[in-house]
Amino acid sequence: LAGAISLKDIPEVEYAALYNDLKERLKQDNYHVAHYFATPDGNNLRFYLILLDDAEHKVMVATFTMEYYDEVALPSLTALHPAMHVYEREIAELYNVEFDTMPWNKPLRFPFNRRNRNSTMDNYPFYTIEGDSLHEVNVGPIHAGIIEPGAFRFICKGENVLHLEIALGYQHRGVESEFTKTTNRLRQTLLAEAIAGDTA
């Protein structure tokens, strides 16, 4: 593929150096993270981060590893840059990686292959506010409409919405792992359209 990079050519860094570099870069508007994920690599967990520089039109990729069962908490990038929460929540959910100082580390999608099998919808950590004048309104995950199924939980005081919690991903059902089972571009396109909903 044009522009592809070999895995062996991706620079490997220490997490502390990556964290400190991102802490400064993400303060600038021209940088944003395109993807941040982890995957098993023997007895290790290998993390990949793809950073885009919109001003210079550059794609930067870095990787770091930690032992798969290492219980050392990583400093959370979400605490500094809230947009990182989806990436860190998915990594935490899939591999039980702890991110120190991460605000409200709730599960993202409950995939079938999640590491913490005790984490279920029955003990999902919904955000709560106590008060006699408050009420909750739950909508979904099945609702009339063409958008992706989702659960929406409103906490209201009269007609004012104080908090809205959105839970999406109900129709993914492990579709990401289906992509890895085929190299057929037509099959991959059909899978992508199947999860895209009204944006297909």
Region locations from a protein language model:
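Active-site- and interface-proximal helix/loop "cap" or "latch" segments in soluble metabolic
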Residues: 138-200
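Terminal low-complexity/charged segments
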Residues: 1-164
